[in-house]
Amino acid sequence: MEIFGKTFREGRFVLKEKNFTVEFAVEKIHLGWKISGRVKGSPGRLEVLRTKAPEKVLVNNWQSWGPCRVVDAFSFKPPEIDPNWRYTASVVPDVLERNLQSDYFVAEEGKVYGFLSSKIAHPFFAVEDGELVAYLEYFDVEFDDFVPLEPLVVLEDPNTPLLLEKYAELVGMENNARVPKHTPTGWCSWYHYFLDLTWEETLKNLKLAKNFPFEVFQIDDAYEKDIGDWLVTRGDFPSVEEMAKVIAENGFIPGIWTAPFSVSETSDVFNEHPDWVVKENGEPKMAYRNWNKKIYALDLSKDEVLNWLFDLFSSLRKMGYRYFKIDFLFAGAVPGERKKNITPIQAFRKGIETIRKAVGEDSFILGCGSPLLPAVGCVDGMRIGPDTAPFWGEHIEDNGAPAARWALRNAITRYFMHDRFWLNDPDCLILREEKTDLTQKEKELYSYTCGVLDNMIIESDDLSLVRDHGKKVLKETLELLGGRPRVQNIMSEDLRYEIVSSGTLSGNVKIVVDLNSREYHLEKEGKSSLKKRVVKREDGRNFYFYEEGERE
């Protein structure tokens, strides 16, 4: 194994090249090694580590929707990248077009390689001619002074799930992760109504929601005039402020969806400020195409854009919103021309830090379609898979497209991020009896697995279509929360997983799920008398203690 082209060994080193200088240290830590340091100059795409590639690897996509899966490193074929969604596939798509790529970390049986942060550079791994190579992508930005390297750890132990959990703990410590003690439950409009939501249907569900164990009532995409024009409503919707008022009057925490780093070509904000977006050759650069429109990315290096973002979210907070689902966040990190000479990752972090400052420490931010590592420490919850859907999706390609099957798979393979990076959002439960192709068993499989994983539980249905079976599944899912989950065979290639969780509201539980046959087997050991206590340490980590006494 080589580090910055040198034989791997403990110590402090200096690498001086024509365009850049790296000062780095290799130190022994629990279960492995840590490489840290600093760089100045023009490092470009900086090679950090090189070693022999394993055959079977767990690879990870850089953002919420992308797959996290086990693949054969030597039989991998690069995917066809949809030009409309180029940057959801990779922020360095030229790599993915040629090689197997994994962002932030990569795992094999008994070993995990993982970067602990993404504050300036984009960290990724590529398999090149039988070798696993770790890179830091600096996007051709020049640094006059030294800036910190994103630290890299190499962890080894026969227990691979333990290594992934340890890696996630180190990431949480490095980034002062936000891990709320309380996990909100709620309702979301999207997976029943999509863009056809009306205020009349919203009010109907608001009344029905009082019969469900929900705290948050979140309005998703459909209310806004256009992408970017978030404070102007359409159709029969009242003002954004009135929506929050009515939700709060009915006893719920008001929640709202935005895609804050995106503006459509038809939006007022773009037409009034065409210079606010990331450019290519001096012209607005399409970040992606959706809603039958070109979508541009806000230039988050511009002070006036950050001021606009702050005003937007501080206004939403003043209106009463306390739950913010912020979506399509990858747009903030697309490569391109920005006003300031900073990396796309630095720009993204400026944007998300501005939103956090605007909504306050007591608001809940749910990230979605987001770069993962750069968001740690800013969001409270994070979507960690593609959109679910009212169908299983056995014929849907595993490329981030909506499907219940792949959404649940990612909740399983990214399980270790939960309670360490943030709260994992596996996407919404769909429990209605009509207007869905999901079978009763598929609904149970999805819901119970999310419960055993201790994930966020948000339901998305026309609540008038949820009958006794759906209510029973929701109740039983909530009773599976509160534990410490572990996917024991995380390196499974056949989509069959064994998940255990200790200390849940139902005691110690185990669920064996098969995402191909859609079968599951749930075992409960019975309730324990142990009470779970959460203590937040000074370094930001949550520690979990189980004490004798009545359960909470």
From Swiss-Prot:
<dbReference type="InterPro" id="IPR055092">
    <property type="entry name" value="GalA_N"/>
</dbReference>
<dbReference type="InterPro" id="IPR017853">
    <property type="entry name" value="Glycoside_hydrolase_SF"/>
</dbReference>
<comment type="similarity">
    <text>Belongs to the glycosyl hydrolase 36 family.</text>
</comment>
<keyword id="KW-0378">Hydrolase</keyword>
<feature type="binding site">
    <location>
        <begin position="325"/>
        <end position="327"/>
    </location>
    <ligand>
        <name>substrate</name>
    </ligand>
</feature>
<dbReference type="Pfam" id="PF22676">
    <property type="entry name" value="GalA_N"/>
</dbReference>
<protein>
    <recommendedName>
        <fullName>Alpha-galactosidase</fullName>
        <ecNumber>3.2.1.22</ecNumber>
    </recommendedName>
</protein>
<dbReference type="GO" id="GO:0005975">
    <property type="term" value="P:carbohydrate metabolic process"/>
</dbReference>
<feature type="active site" description="Proton donor/acceptor">
    <location>
        <position position="387"/>
    </location>
</feature>
<dbReference type="Pfam" id="PF02065">
    <property type="entry name" value="Melibiase"/>
</dbReference>
<feature type="binding site">
    <location>
        <position position="368"/>
    </location>
    <ligand>
        <name>substrate</name>
    </ligand>
</feature>
<dbReference type="InterPro" id="IPR050985">
    <property type="entry name" value="Alpha-glycosidase_related"/>
</dbReference>
<dbReference type="GO" id="GO:0004557">
    <property type="term" value="F:alpha-galactosidase activity"/>
</dbReference>
<comment type="subunit">
    <text>Homodimer.</text>
</comment>
<feature type="binding site">
    <location>
        <position position="191"/>
    </location>
    <ligand>
        <name>substrate</name>
    </ligand>
</feature>
<comment type="function">
    <text>Hydrolyzes the short-chain alpha-galactosaccharides raffinose, melibiose and stachyose.</text>
</comment>
<dbReference type="GO" id="GO:0030246">
    <property type="term" value="F:carbohydrate binding"/>
</dbReference>
<keyword id="KW-0119">Carbohydrate metabolism</keyword>
<keyword id="KW-0326">Glycosidase</keyword>
<feature type="binding site">
    <location>
        <begin position="220"/>
        <end position="221"/>
    </location>
    <ligand>
        <name>substrate</name>
    </ligand>
</feature>
<dbReference type="GO" id="GO:0016139">
    <property type="term" value="P:glycoside catabolic process"/>
</dbReference>
<feature type="binding site">
    <location>
        <position position="65"/>
    </location>
    <ligand>
        <name>substrate</name>
    </ligand>
</feature>
<dbReference type="InterPro" id="IPR011013">
    <property type="entry name" value="Gal_mutarotase_sf_dom"/>
</dbReference>
<feature type="active site" description="Nucleophile">
    <location>
        <position position="327"/>
    </location>
</feature>
<feature type="binding site">
    <location>
        <position position="383"/>
    </location>
    <ligand>
        <name>substrate</name>
    </ligand>
</feature>
<dbReference type="InterPro" id="IPR013785">
    <property type="entry name" value="Aldolase_TIM"/>
</dbReference>
<dbReference type="GO" id="GO:0042803">
    <property type="term" value="F:protein homodimerization activity"/>
</dbReference>
